[in-house]
Amino acid sequence: MSNESPIGAKTRATRRRALSPLVGLVVLGCAASATHANRGDIRIADTDVYPESVTSTSDGTIYVGSIKGNVYRAAPDENVALPWITTSEENGILTILGVFADEANGTLWLCSVPNFFGPERSQGVSSLMAFDLETGEQEGVYPFPPPASACNDIAIGPDGSVFATDTPNGRIFRLEPGADALELYGADPALVGIDGIAFAEDGTLYVNNVRTNEIFRVEQNRRGEMTGLTKLTVSHELSGPDGFRHIEGNRFLQAEGPIGRVSIVTIEGDTATLTILTDELTSTPGATPVGDTAYAIESQIGHLTDPALRNTPPGPFMLYAVPMR
């Protein structure tokens, strides 16, 4: 989530979108086959969306969460994302920060959070929610324990456990397979501002911090308990690191909203090296890999937070196709 909201929103609404050229970058391994290379940009077919997170499956289906409280889905090779799961009294979705497609378990996980920009849907408890990945039927609701929390992003561990970040309180929660409630996996003052979360192929957990502009490796013992954090040395100065998605091996896709940057992050030991794909987007809180393409969202959140833009209607809400090769 961007550092203009109470948990750290990001605004860069005056910048124009222009993709910088990417020369000589070869990415080994993709989230889907290269058959989606000609798909192009994707339009979200709705108004007042303000997308915040994006995820994808191996066939190229893309899912987008939004401040509006809806999940939008673009089927493989389609360039329009349509409302798929919509907020209702029955499902209790408030606004949506993180979304994550868990193909192994057939589940779409999302973070429901009280609406910072209310008054509609501004009351309630932040929760991790589960929906069937095929039908969109709600399967579970897992409220975050007090104090007031903000579930921000999600990752799946090697054993199928679900991990979710709590930005304002610096906590990571875990939902083990078959469990009916979240348990505290770890907490640390250095995690206040925690946002993106992802596992490497070897099972190592990494997180970023949208407030302190850092990336950490999460240390754990053989019992699977968090024992500490290791701050990584980063090749570039970060600005509001947000969505963090595993690509393959020790490579990740990271979005930074305030500077409109999407990068591949390669982690070797205690060093994280960024290969910049673009730094000319506007307030981009997330990106997801589909084949050789990163699909990046522009939130246009400034139209909710910037007095100069508040009475100006935003343009179309888009996912922009950024080459990863």
What does each of the following model-derived ranges do?
Residues 47, 62-68, 102, 108-123, ...:
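Conserved beta-strand positions in repeat-built beta-propeller and related beta-rich domains
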Residues 38-44, 80-89, 137-144, 181-188, ...:
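A short beta-strand motif characteristic of beta-propeller blades
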